[in-house]
Each structure stands twice: as structure tokens, then as C-alpha cells.
């Protein structure tokens, strides 16, 4: 293996959404690999955004604003800026907590610094970090996607806090490259398939479930980010070979390289 290009000769399926795919592909190329981008998900605003605008106008009622993804930050602040243009008063920002380094980086780019970023990049880790602040009557606003897990809302509510789930974006399966994906798998042109969320796993399976995908991928390494993504794959009998302890694409790529070296 070339130490400067450890992924040389490997074709890696990048299933990230279109806006996030380029950065991951760039890292694959830098390591000598060949990325193929087939986005399995797309993200869009909810059809009815009235409740989002009203909630943002009343942001002062919340002690905490919680983001669990980069998309949550991007969509929330798009709405926030739109509301600011229409109101004369300033809208104070609550204390902010986030999950994940990418979410934190996106928030910092908007000009805001989170009070809490847990070491563990999952909802359970965030709840443990928030626990000292969770008291009866304390109000938390969670700006998230429609497919987000209910864990945080459930735990906050269970401990007496008032948790409001604000859906600022919707995750939709993307099947536009379905035939291309099936052809690549059938012709065994893919060496490694990556998943970055449970939703990407489910959409992949939805596309291939009526095919002979198991035979077509018997040589493929499946790699994913996070225990929830692995759980979704296990449920659908997709064999995960690589799942890093840190839930970022950088660590995912490092683990793929380490696996190939072994």
C-alpha cells in the first residue's frame, strides 16, 4: 500500500446529500481513492413554515436552543434571518447546545458559539451534558429534521423540562440515480460503500432490496458513521465492517485506511 495514497485503486461510493458530498469526495481523492457520488437523500423546507416563523419570533421564551445536525443549523438560520428582516425588535438568542463538530463549525460560521458540545457525538451524549441544566419548567427548543430520533425530547420531558420539537427541514429519499447505482453494483465497480446516517442506509436498501445486491456486494466493504446508522444496517442485514468510535467523515476515512492496512 502506498503510504501517501492509501486508497489507490479503491472506488468508494459517497452517499451523502449533494451539498455535503463534495467535501468527503475531496478527502477520498486526497488519499488516492476514486469517489463516486450518488446522493441517497435530499433536504427541503417543510411545506408549512408558519409555526417556524412564530416560534422564532418567540425565541426569548426558551432557555436553550438545541441543534443535532449541520442541516438543522443551516435551515434554522435561514428562517431566522427571514424573520429578522420582518420584525423591528431584536430577537435574543438562547444558550445553544449542539451535537457534533460539523454542527459546531457550522454554528460558529453563523457567528454563534455553543455553550455545550458533548464529547460523544450522539443525542445520549448531549443529554448527559445538559443534565445539570434540566429542571422542571426549563424550556428547550430543538431545531431538527422530521426523521430525528425522539430520544432527546423524551428524556428532557421525562426529567420535567419543557421540550419543543421544531421541524426546520425534511429528509427525503433521492432515487434519481437509482439505475446508475444498480449498474455499478451489478458490474462490481464499487469497493467500499459509506453510510453517514440511518436514513442513507434505509434509502440504499429501498433501492436495492428487489435486486441481487447481496451477491453483487460480496466483495464490498461497508462503512458507516455512528451506532444508530450501524443499528439500521444490522436490522436490514447489511454487513458493516467499519464503524469508527468518533462519528465524523475524517475518522471514517481513517478507519477505512486502517482496515485496509490490516
Predicted regions, residues:
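Signature of uroporphyrinogen-III synthase
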Residues: 1-262
